Amino acid sequence: MTVLVTDTGFAPDDWIDGYIPLVALSDTPDELYSLGIDLTRPELDQRDLDRIKRVLPRTGLIRIFVRSFGDTSALTLARSLRDAGYEGRLRAHGAMLARFYTFARRAGFDEVELTPVQARMQPREHWRNELDWTPVYRVPRPRGSAKYSGTS
């Protein structure tokens, strides 16, 4: 059974409407249910991105596959969808590490989907959204601090 990671901890998966792969996505509105879109690759060409943008108002959840621990394209896609006005749920799944949860949340993901094995290997207490976290490159350097010159 799938385990979801949110800012409140672990929770069971509550999405009941299923997923549609991008290739099966129709432009015809279907008001009977909220769409769940399953993106198996985070790189989309402009045509696919436009297609998703057209159905955003009736999309309840978009699940984006993270291929490897260093794959930032899923984060970029999440940010692009938020910038396009998507307000529904964004879910990351695949190769996710607890220490990247803050990155995922800052990119626009609402939750992370784990397999039972992933949840056992990375328990609830490892998944924290560090609200006061700032990337090292954004921390202002104190005035007059020594800079590395490359010489001894």
PLM regions: where:
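N-terminal, charge-rich interaction modules
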Residues: M1-P29
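Glycine/Thr-rich beta-alpha phosphate-binding loop at enzyme active sites
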Residues: S34-D83, D132
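Phosphate/adenylate-binding glycine loop and adjacent helical scaffold
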Residues: V3-D14, I37-D45, R128, K147
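Hydrophobic faces of well-ordered beta-strands that scaffold small-molecule active sites
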Residues: G18-V23, Y33-T40, G60-I64, G88-A92, ...
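Catalytic cores of alpha/beta
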Residues: L49-R54, L97-E111
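Glycine-rich phosphate-binding active-site loops on the catalytic face of alpha/beta enzymes
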Residues: A107-W127
